Design a protein with these regions (language model features):
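Short, solvent-exposed alpha-helical "recognition" segments
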Residues: 36, 49-52, 79
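Helix-turn-helix DNA-binding elements, focusing on the entry/boundary residues of the two helices
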Residues: 12, 23, 39, 54-57
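Hydrophobic packing within well-folded, soluble alpha/beta domains
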Residues: 12, 16, 26, 60-61, ...
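A short, Lys/Arg-rich alpha-helix, primarily the initiator
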Residues: 1-19
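Short alpha-helical DNA-recognition segment
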Residues: 20-44
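Residue-level detection of the helix-turn-helix DNA-binding "recognition helix"
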Residues: 17, 31-32, 47-49, 76
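Short, charged recognition helix plus adjacent turn
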Residues: 2, 62, 69-82
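DNA major-groove recognition helix of helix-turn-helix/homeodomain DNA-binding modules
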Residues: 49, 53-70
Length: 82
């Protein structure tokens, strides 16, 4: 399976690590906000194995308390990751 299905996975993992959250804890926090998410889905997002919807992106910004632009890599690192 391709690992280039999203560009925000690495930053999702980074923000999660910064907060000391497990994938299960992040999934639970997202579920409390109304976003269906499991540890397995989080793992696939972080390893860039699945597409992330615009609605999921909104939930990630809310749960992490960041602007949407912070989820996306800088242009230079985006080009290097492809």
């Amino acid at each position: 399976m391709s690992r280039n299905r999203n560009v925000i996975g690495r930053n999702v993992a980074r923000f999660r690590y910064q907060r000391g959250w497990s994938q299960e804890r992040l999934a639970a926090k997202l579920q409390l906000l109304g976003c269906y998410m499991t540890r397995h889905i989080i793992a696939n997002i972080e390893t860039r194995r699945c597409v992330v919807t615009d609605v999921q992106i909104e939930f990630f910004t809310e749960v992490f308390g960041v602007d949407v632009g912070e989820l996306f890599p800088q242009k230079r690192s985006l080009l290097q990751s492809m």
